[in-house]
Amino acid sequence: RGLGDVYKRQVFLDQQRLGKPKDEADALRMLTDLAGRRHTVCTGVTLRQGQRSLTRAQSTDVYFRPAGREELMAYIRGGEPMDKAGAYGVQGQGALLVERIDGDFFNVMGLPVLLLSRMLAEFGVTLL
């Protein structure tokens, strides 16, 4: 049997989970709250094969630089934030809002590659 997988990226600011924005105003609120501050991105990964299941999580601290309303609205109007937890994607223009990342960059993207490879090894699958 093959392996099934599930990934879930979540963004937390001061213990509050920031989901996907409902609209542009919600995206602006989230990005304004994140601007100039540290937040945490957590990604949960579950692998399944038959009856066997393995779940792990990875956390990474992300520091946003200060950003003004006009700059944030320009980003929002591009559409990138609307389908992303925390209203940004580090792999796109959202990278311009990030000042520093402490931890796994790929986790911030939503796929902690090293964690996934270690989990796959527990199922006997090696990537290198």
Predicted regions and their residues:
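Anionic-ligand binding patches
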Residues: 1, 5, 9-128
